[in-house]
Amino acid sequence: MINNTVLEFERNEAGSNEGLGDPGVETFSNTPYYSAAKESGQNSKDAMSKGPVKMAFLLHKIKAEQLPLHDSLLETVNHCLNRKDVTENCDSKEKDFFTNAKMILNRAEIPVLEISDSNTTGLVGPAIDGKPFYSLLKGAGISDKPSITSNGSFGIGKDASFAISDLRTVLYSTLYKDASTGIESFLAQGKVKLASHIDSQGVARKRTAWWGYSGFQAIDKHLDVPCWMKRSEIGTSVFSIGFREEELWQHRMAAALLTTFFIAIVDKEMEFNVDNTISITAETISKYFEDPEIAAAAVESGSKEEFEFSKSLYKCYISSDSVDYEKDISASGVGSIGKFQIRVLKQKGLPKRVGFVRNGIFITDNLKNFNHPFRVFPRYSDFIALVSPLN
């Protein structure tokens, strides 16, 4: 058992009432598996050091005594069950959540989903303002991604991992190469988002906590984390504690990965292992686009249209019948936004739509923010077009 780490909630000096309704987490509550796969994939792609980026989505069953913040977390859940919103105002949503959380923590084993990557830079530290590790754990409304062409900014997307945790608890561990010394360095920390409460000493606490060294500090020694959090190669692991293990979760995540990263997969820039049962690579992607269970999972998660659209874009990308064009594109009030490649496939049954990709990732099917919806082409024969920037 790790005994020199602590779970610390911020003091609630203002006495504010903070419930479970965290805006970031709620954003992904309707599509938790799809969102967690997409957002984590974008972060790993942005951190690519060499190809292909290899990502794994693996379910572990961790013994309760191997979860270092277990006792503190259970104690906090009990405090949250004593909140007035639960005991007096009969907030059934909060009561149901914390009752379920208590049940999970009282089990002998706790489900944990690990989302890990390799062939990346890892979450570069140290754990100070201005570094990616700090931005992910403690940043709000800031970006420390390495490039303006990055596909995210550790913004609201980082909350997707909380949406698949029935304990609203996520732990992070990373191994990266220190730029000044060239030495591989380790960092780990955890974050918890519950509700404001009164602790066992009668001190008012906010809903957010960090697990690590005392004083909200990140862990920098492998010896101070359990074995399942250790890293042997450069990269990052994100652990959603109390993972919500619903039926077909693997296929829902696979649908998101195919929808979003099909170009990166074909170009051998990314590979995905989902629960050691689904292995998505350049050689297997066609098979999984035709997999009936993945297609059904896309329907169930409300992403059927996106999945089928990406499937058509994938056909356009790999087909020898597709035709390539180059064009400078301008936007009203902006002027030229650069040179783009437009790849077009004409074939009966295609949806007459245009898809935009960047850095090997599907971004959108329209430019409505630039006054160019590109959604309806009624007078054209069936086609699909794939647009990507060349500069």
How should these model regions be labeled?
Residues S16-D22, Y34-S40, D91-N100, E109, ...:
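Short linear interaction motifs
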Residues I2-G15, V25-S35, K45-S49, G202-N391:
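N-terminal assembly/transducer modules of large multi-domain enzymes
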Residues V77-K102, K138-K145, S196-W228:
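Surface-exposed acidic, glycine/proline-enriched linker/cap segments
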Residues S49, E65-P68, L123-P126, A163, ...:
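Short helix/loop capping segments that flank catalytic or ligand/cofactor-binding pockets
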Residues D85-I183, L187-L194:
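Flexible ATP-lid and adjacent glycine-rich G1/G2 motifs of the Bergerat
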Residues M1-S116, V124-Y134:
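Bergerat-fold GHKL ATPase/HATPase_c domain
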Residues G51-S72, V170-G215:
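Flexible phosphate/Mg2+-sensing switch loops adjacent to catalytic phosphate-binding sites
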